[in-house]
């Protein structure tokens, strides 16, 4: 009976008594690992759908509700900082580099992953605005979670990433609260992981070099500047994996910096005052030339197919155009390259 009374009294005192002054202590770990040890993640995406974010279906992260014990009106927020180099951005959020091929999106915040702040840059930033505990004991936690990002065009491959330091979160006392000598900063490292990256693309069924014979015309068929006459036509055909949307860019092989819609004639041409324009299908607007690159969003890139087409094709029409410089008859030769982007 006496022993029971002592236990009951101890519990009663712990519950009933208020904390009359601000207190804080560190009860976490200064070094923390993010994600499972030796994680392995797999995904499939179109070859040029980059940067490609791995959505693993769960959070690759670290969370701990008990990093600091606080009480007695102590006010605390959190700041976060990423130490990895910024190699790009996606929807306003920094992409941080791990290797040449693999990057990270990073979120930091309090214990709840869903309230994490999307990190940008390499400066300290507010990741949890904070709160003031009442006259009782409680805890302050934190969380970090990441998503891998494929950065570069490649064939299907496996990428291994070694353990890497990410950055830090620090406790930020405010409203007169002070941490004193208490540990305020904790560090994070990403555990090693492997990405099994499968890419989808297309195969060109048309020969890689296509010669279009241009019809002979008279100068009288192009009487005014801007007048056009059909010179020739050809088609491009591909066989694609399911879900691939094909985009294409025409590049002027003679003048690669050309961004107009008139193809430069080669040095072998003897005619002057005439140029070539290229149209696709039934479009009334000619295609413009752009850089020789498969990068998503390349200048003057145009959509050739949708993701529902596995055997896409495009009909191309080449037209003579009067450039307004006075036509002198002769031969006309032009070279354009096509670069496909599988998105």
UniProtKB/Swiss-Prot annotation:
Protein's cellular compartments: Fimbrium
Pfam families documented for this protein: Fim-adh_lectin (PF09222), Fimbrial (PF00419)
UniProt GO BP: adhesion of symbiont to host; cell adhesion involved in single-species biofilm formation
InterPro entries hit by this protein: Adhesion_dom_fimbrial, Adhesion_dom_fimbrial_sf, Adhesion_dom_sf, Bact_Fimbrial_Adh_Pro, Fimbrial_adhesin_lectin_dom
Molecular function terms from GO: carbohydrate binding
Disulfide bonds: 75-132
Domain of life: Bacteria
Keyword Transport: no
Keywords: Disulfide bond, Fimbrium, Lectin, Plasmid, Signal, Virulence
Chain intervals for the UniProt region annotation (Disordered): 287-307
Main subcellular localisation: other
Region (Fimbrillin-binding domain): 200-343
Positions with a binding annotation for a carbohydrate: 65-66, 110-111, 138-141
Entry-linked SUPFAM superfamilies: Bacterial adhesins
Signal peptide (from-to): 1-22
Region named Receptor-binding lectin domain: 23-199
A single cellular component GO annotation: pilus
Residue ranges with Polar residues bias: 298-307
UniProt function note: Essential fimbrial adhesion factor that mediates binding to N-acetylglucosamine-containing receptors in the host intestinal microvilli, leading to colonization of the intestinal tissue, and diarrhea or septicemia. Also confers adhesiveness to laminin and basement membranes.
Family in the record: Belongs to the fimbrial protein family.
Protein name (record): F17b-G fimbrial adhesin
High-level lineage: Bacteria, Pseudomonadati, Pseudomonadota, Gammaproteobacteria, Enterobacterales
Gene encoding the protein: f17bG
